[in-house]
Regions:
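Gly/Ser/Thr-rich beta-alpha loop segments that engage phosphate groups in nucleotides
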Residues: 11, 51, 60-62, 83, ...
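Flexible, glycine-rich phosphate/dinucleotide-binding loops
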Residues: 30, 38, 94
């Protein structure tokens, strides 16, 4: 069964360009209205995902943190709208974050 989500708010597609009527049809975005009614209608603004260009997932004020804390750091970034993180280094391997589809994409740079 096809899942349709309609975003009834404004979509920013450029510095001074707005569109309306964005839909997700089975996860693919389109401005074309499908024949079927939406399963869910969301109101608000749609903006591109954010990039965190300098982050240290897995580090806290005292240095290394447990994996659960590192996960909460990645979730906090995601919940703030960040879809891509440039991780500038951590004590432990954070490669496991890259395997999680529900967390931001991770580009690892620096020492890991």
């Amino acid at each position: 069964m096809t899942r349709i989500i309609e975003f009834s708010g404004t979509v920013l597609t450029g510095p001074q360009t707005e569109h309306h009527g964005l839909r997700s049809v089975d996860g693919l975005l389109t401005f074309h209205r499908p024949a079927a009614a939406p399963d869910l209608v969301l109101d608000g603004w749609v903006i591109p995902g954010l990039v965190d260009a300098h982050c240290h997932i897995g580090l806290g004020p005292g240095g290394d943190v447990p994996e659960g804390v590192a996960e909460r750091q990645a979730v906090a970034d995601r919940d703030a709208g960040t879809l891509l993180v440039r991780d500038a280094g951590a004590v432990h391997d954070t490669r496991w974050i890259q395997q999680r589809a529900d967390l931001p994409r991770l580009i690892r740079s620096g020492r890991h």
